[in-house]
């Protein structure tokens, strides 16, 4: 039973309040130089959490990750070339 998770990137003015983000999900990474934190939460709650987090005075902006919507399984080039050759042979017959 695996939950679908999505990352939320929270850009902040100060990193002092990073600990307060723990109640919204799992804080995966914090960049001290660029002042942002990556927060993982359930996909069903992403909209609500991003609205709540963006209301804090120390938050500059909130961005959602598009990784769950990207294709991560790729076909090899050889398989694609083999399929194209087979199609060409069938068309010529």
Curated annotation (Swiss-Prot):
Localization terms from the record: Cytoplasm
Record has Kinase as a keyword: no
Gene Ontology terms: cellular component: cytoplasm
InterPro entries to which the protein is assigned, alphabetical: DUF2129
Key words of the record: Cytoplasm
Annotated signal peptide: none
Main location: cytoplasm
Record family assignment: Belongs to the UPF0298 family.
Name under which the protein is recorded: UPF0298 protein lwe2074
